């Protein structure tokens, strides 16, 4: 099973992890994934604040909620997972860049 932002989004919506939807689910997922991949909380919030106002504390909260969903996937597919996340992120980044 390949893990993409769409699969993560479906699982988050099923479990109702986020009570409020002031920020889009995609931004919350992207924040959690960027932190998971090694960026600091402040760097993630600085990067995403170009699109929406987001604090480093929000990034931390999003990550801890998304972590529950990410831990459900088998560990042997971690490399494929990271590659698909990066591809999904680049598609999202290019889409946002085309809007500006």
Curated annotation (Swiss-Prot):
Protein name: Uncharacterized protein MJ0139.1
